[in-house]
Regions:
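Catalytic phosphate-donor-binding core of small-molecule kinases
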Residues: 2-7, 15, 20, 34, ...
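Short hydrophobic segments within beta-strands
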Residues: 12-14, 198
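A solvent-exposed, charged loop/short amphipathic helix patch at secondary-structure junctions
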Residues: 24-46
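A short, basic/flexible loop-to-alpha-helix module at the beginning of a structural domain
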Residues: 74-82
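Structural motif
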Residues: 86-87
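N-terminal glycine-rich "phosphate-gripper" loop used for MgATP/nucleotide binding
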Residues: 90-94
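Short glycine/serine/threonine-rich phosphate/pyrophosphate-binding segments
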Residues: 96-101, 203-208
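Short, acidic/small-residue loops that bind anionic groups at enzyme active sites
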Residues: 103-123
Length: 306
C-alpha cells in the first residue's frame, strides 16, 4: 500500500532591488558607487533586502520538516509544473500574487507581506509567523479563501492569456489602436488609445481611475463577483469610427470580441507586464470573458489561533 505524498509548498518570490543591483554591477561597492553618483545611497535598499530575507527565512521555518517544499523566482513561473494540491506561498508585494495567479488552476495561495512599511498588503495580508497555521488549515481543507475572479482572453489561433487585475488591448507605442469591438448589442469600428478590461481586483487601480474620470459611470464589480468591466480609452470620433461602445459590464458567460486592424504594433498584455505581451495584428480576433479559473486567496480560518 503506497503512502500518500506529503503536501508540497511552493514559496515564490521576486529578486530584491539589492539583488538586481548586485547582478547589474557585480559587487556591493560598485553598486554603492553607482548610486552615489545618482545622489542616492545603498543603505536603505540593503535594509529592505534584509527585511525580505528575514521574512523568507521565517516562512521557511514555518514549513513542517516532513513536507516537501520548493523555492521559485517569479521569472521561473512559466517553466514550473504546479501540482494539483500544491500550496503556494507568495512572499512579496501585491503584484507578485497577480504574477503567480495566471499559472494556477485553483491551488490555494497564501500571500505574505515581508515589509509592511513598503507594501500595502491587500493581496499579501499575512505576516510570516502566521504561515504554519495557514498551511495546516490548507492541508486540512479548513482554510477560508476568497475566490477572486480573473479575466481571460482567447485568440483565434488558440493562444490564451489570464490576468488577475486587467488586460490591455492597444498599440505598443503611443499610436492609436484600430480595431472592431463587438458586444451583444452590436459591433463598432474604433480608433482609440486602447481598451482596458478589468476584474473586481483590478477595479481599485486603472479601471477605478478611468471610471472616476467619467463620473462613476459604471458600478465596478467586487473581487469575487463573476463580472468584468471594460473601458475604451479616448475613442476618436473620426470618419468611419464610432464612439458608442466605450464602456460596459460583462457578466457570467457574456463575451467581448475585439478584432484587430493593426498591421504592426498591436499587443495584448495582462496586469501591466508588457514583456509577456501577445501580438495582436490585423485580422486577429480576441474573445474576452470572466474566466472559469479563479484565484483562491487564503484568509484566516474561523477558530484558528491567528
Amino acid at each position: 500500500m503506497s503512502r500518500a505524498l506529503a503536501p508540497r509548498i511552493v514559496v515564490v518570490r521576486r529578486p530584491t532591488e539589492y539583488e538586481l543591483l548586485i547582478q547589474q554591477h557585480g559587487t556591493r561597492s560598485q553598486a554603492a558607487f553607482y548610486l552615489e553618483r545618482q545622489g542616492q545611497k545603498i543603505d536603505e535598499i540593503e535594509e529592505r533586502h534584509r527585511r525580505i530575507e528575514r521574512a523568507l527565512d521565517a516562512v521557511r521555518r514555518e514549513i513542517p520538516l516532513a513536507w516537501r517544499n520548493v523555492g521559485l523566482l517569479r521569472s521561473e513561473l512559466d517553466r514550473f509544473v504546479f501540482e494539483e494540491k500544491d500550496i503556494i506561498v507568495a512572499v512579496g508585494q501585491d503584484g507578485l500574487v497577480a504574477n503567480v495567479a495566471k499559472y494556477l488552476q485553483g491551488q490555494s495561495v497564501i500571500g505574505v507581506n515581508p515589509d509592511p512599511t513598503t507594501y500595502e498588503g491587500v493581496l499579501v495580508p499575512h505576516e510570516p509567523a502566521a504561515v504554519a497555521d495557514l498551511l495546516a488549515d490548507c492541508a486540512a481543507g479548513r482554510a477560508s479563501t476568497e475566490s477572486r475572479t480573473m479575466v481571460e482572453v482567447v485568440l483565434d489561433d488558440g493562444q490564451r492569456l489570464l490576468a488577475l487585475n486587467e488586460i490591455f488591448f492597444g498599440h505598443r507605442s503611443h499610436q492609436s489602436a484600430r480595431y472592431r469591438i463587438a458586444v451583444a448589442s452590436g459591433e463598432e469600428r474604433q480608433s482609440s488609445s486602447g481598451v482596458i478590461v478589468s476584474t473586481g481586483t483590478g477595479a481599485t487601480g486603472w479601471a477605478r481611475s478611468i471610471n472616476q474620470e467619467r463620473n462613476g459611470i459604471l458600478p465596478l464589480p467586487t473581487p469575487e463577483e463573476p463580472t468584468i468591466a471594460f473601458f475604451v480609452r479616448e475613442a476618436f470620433p473620426g470618419s468611419g469610427f464610432g464612439t458608442k461602445t466605450t464602456y460596459g459590464l460583462l457578466r457570467t458567460q457574456e463575451e467581448l470580441r475585439i478584432i484587430s486592424e493593426m498591421s504592426v504594433g498591436g499587443v495584448i498584455f495582462g496586469d501591466g507586464i508588457e514583456e509577456d505581451s501577445v501580438e495582436f495584428l490585423w485580422g486577429s480576433t480576441a474573445t474576452v470573458l470572466a474566466s472559469k479559473t479563479r484565484l483562491e486567496l487564503v484568509r484566516a480560518a474561523q477558530g484558528s489561533r491567528r
